[in-house]
A protein has these predicted regions:
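Conserved cofactor-binding/catalytic machinery of classical short-chain dehydrogenase/reductase
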Residues: 7-10, 21, 45-46, 111-114
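Structural signature of the Rossmann-like NAD(P)-dependent dehydrogenase/reductase core
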Residues: 21-26, 62-68, 108, 134
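Conserved Rossmann-fold NAD(P)-dependent oxidoreductase catalytic core, especially the SDR/UDP-sugar
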Residues: 2, 6-40, 62
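C-terminal substrate-binding subdomain of Rossmann-fold SDR/epimerase-dehydratase oxidoreductases
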Residues: 91-194
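Active-site loop of short-chain dehydrogenase/reductase
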Residues: 15-23, 58-60, 96, 102, ...
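Alpha-helical structural signal in soluble globular domains
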Residues: 10, 14-17, 49-53, 145, ...
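NAD(P)-dependent short-chain dehydrogenase/reductase
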Residues: 38-40, 44, 48-106, 112-121, ...
Length: 194
């Protein structure tokens, strides 16, 4: 809570004091019931704080939602690591990959280079979004499909985590396309070249 909420308030204060545009890192978890996860709740509250600051105090701010970011530099051996990083680390150690639940939950995966490209376009643009910019591919895969992309790896299925949602998929929002943004990186190619 302190990082996502207190940290957001501090960044807002800084942006207001210095008159700079704020780009807030939201999350695709915003499209699900925020009461199912402390993380989702704090991201939801952060977005609402930013919107309130825009509406009442004229804060120049844009909210950007990310979808399962992967790529070079990602965390691999941390409780904060995303699934691609965790699986890379497990495979490198010769360990099985861990799949929570049945593996049929679907995720929209977005490469870090595409995220950075989108963030730069949003930061440099005069355009605003009344809600949030969505940086995702618009295509999702089941975790079993992603595991297949890694080839013949041992899998261990464990009980699903409470609050784990069944699907993420970038909503059909053409606003980001008007900035000339489109994802260029393909998950399967990235995994093949690891």
């Amino acid at each position: 809570f302190s990082v996502n909420l207190d940290g957001t308030k501090e960044v807002v204060r800084y942006a207001k004091r210095n008159g700079c545009k704020l780009i807030y890192s939201g999350s695709s978890s915003r499209h699900h019931n925020p009461e199912l996860s402390p993380y989702a709740m704090t991201k939801h509250m952060g977005e609402e704080w930013i919107k309130m600051e825009r509406r009442i105090f004229g804060l120049r701010a844009e909210i950007v939602r990310f979808y399962n970011v992967y790529g070079p530099g990602e965390l691999v051996d941390s409780h904060m690591a995303a699934v691609i990083g965790k699986w890379r680390a497990a495979i490198k150690k010769g360990e099985p990959i861990v799949i929570y639940g049945d593996g049929e939950q679907r995720r929209d995966f977005t490469h870090i280079d595409d995220i950075v490209d989108g963030l730069i376009r949003i930061a440099e643009s005069y355009r605003t979004h009344e809600d949030a910019w969505e940086l995702g591919t618009g295509k999702n895969y089941s975790l079993n499909e992603v595991a297949d992309m890694f080839g013949d790896v041992k899998r261990v299925y464990v009980d699903d985590v409470k609050g784990n949602y069944r699907e993420t998929l970038r909503i059909n929002d053409d606003a980001i396309n008007r900035l000339g943004w489109a994802p260029k990186n393909i998950l399967k190619e990235y995994i093949k070249n690891l």
